[in-house]
Amino acid sequence: MKTLVVKCFLLLALVCSCRAADSIWQLCNTNSNISASSQVSKNIDSLLATLVSKTPSKGFKTTTSSSYNNKEKVYGLAQCRGDISNTDCSTCIQDAAKKIREVCQNQSDSRILYDFCFLRYSQENFIGKLDTGAGLIYFNVANVTEIDPKKFDNELGALFDKIRSEAVLPKNKGLGKGKTKLTPFVTLNGLVQCTRDLSELDCAQCFATAVGSFMTTCHNKKGCRVLYSSCYVRYEFYPFYFPLDPAKTGPSVGRISSVHLSP
């Protein structure tokens, strides 16, 4: 059973081309407290240095860092969104590594998500394991008025069936994206991304769990993002993935609600 905690706020600058420095979600497990001078903390610093240097070339990296005592071993993963450049990936991972040590400096189990990248480390080996426990949902509180709600549900479902099927193919490395015309003037844009350590089956399962929120928390809303440690799904009424159409991009200013998911 998941617990939902809802918060509403005014989002003044949710733009289609989010800067790497705009963090979306961070989680510091308070059951994994460590001291700043501990060997585990030093191993985390070493692990982050590896992730910062090695992730941008392929957009993904898993690694470990340990000393003589395996009890102090730390596992790490970093991944950039599959449609961004190596330069943007590098910037995002650097920012993530710096920020996570600031906000989770006393925890050995931490994760941080940006629009362009995701970074996680833990003393528990999470690599290759599906995780849809803790998560976060952002949605636009405005309802869809441009088309009939049932038609919107059908179009949204068809689009995400398509891009989910594309994402689980090995050649696409967990990324699926696409768009569909709702009216001559309104286009629905969608993107899915799972972490590349997952099997095709686990990736598909994560997407199914995340997309399920479209019919509940986000039902008939003009935009929604569902974030888990293992995957990320999003739709908007404006372009937000690359390559962008400069003529159609711009800010979406309005009231956004967030829902925190916990196991």
UniProtKB/Swiss-Prot annotation:
Entries under InterPro entries matching the protein: CRR_secretory_protein, GNK2, GNK2_sf
Ranges for domain Gnk2-homologous: 22-126, 132-240
Cell compartment(s), UniProt: Secreted
Keywords of this entry: Repeat, Secreted, Signal
Record PANTHER family: CYSTEINE-RICH REPEAT SECRETORY PROTEIN 38-RELATED, CYSTEINE-RICH REPEAT SECRETORY PROTEIN 55
UniProt xrefs under Pfam families: Stress-antifung
Protein name stated in the entry: Cysteine-rich repeat secretory protein 55
Entry annotated with the keyword Repeat: yes
Any one annotated GO CC term: secretory vesicle
Highest taxon listed in the record's lineage: Eukaryota
